[in-house]
Amino acid sequence: MPESKPDPSVFPPTAPPPRLVASGLYLVATPIGNLRDMTLRALDVLAAADLVLAEDTRVTAKLLSAYGLKAKLERCDDHASARAAEGAIERLRAGEVVALVSDAGTPMVNDPGFVVARAVIAAGLPVHPIPGPSSLLAALCIAGLPADRVLFAGFLPAKSGARRAALEEVRTARQTLVFF
């Protein structure tokens, strides 16, 4: 049988290859202690990203290096999230792929990245979750407690008075409680 050639009208020789990852903001979960917990889809998104927003660029640079990936990194911590949101929206409007990662686990869980996601959603641009490691779910799995009703209370305040008040708020809760 003769070898078939691709139809040049579909993919002309000068056309760029099709993108495997569509433009959008991708909330990419990262490992929480074992680099082998990274998902293949997360690696695909990070490889395709025009920009990776990171809580700590040094931590994310090590992660990318472990997988042989290179990406433009920008800081997205408590002090830079508003500026990162503006830059992300500009890039997304230009058709680029922007990934948002936290230092460990799933972005948006006690993480300043929510400022970026909220702004992108408000701008009517696409946001895609890339699931993976989650310390919240890992804690529930090993606790041996019912997980059908759960209250996640995040980090308790550092000051004792505020911490007592936060615990008092949930003292009568009938759900399994999870704190960081």
Annotate each predicted stretch with a short phrase:
Residues 2-15, 22-23, 134, 138-180:
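Beta-strand/loop-alpha-helix module characteristic of Rossmann-like adenine-cofactor folds
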Residues 2-78:
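Glycine-rich, flexible N-terminal cofactor/catalytic loop recognition
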Residues 23-25, 94-99, 175-176:
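Loop/turn-to-beta-strand initiation segments
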Residues 32-35, 103-107, 158:
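Short glycine-rich anion-binding loops that position phosphate/pyrophosphate groups of nucleotides
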Residues 46-52, 124-128, 177:
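Short active-site oxyanion
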Residues 75-83, 156-160:
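Conserved helicase motor
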Residues 79-93, 112:
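Short phosphate-binding loop-to-helix
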Residues 93-153:
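Short glycine-cluster motifs
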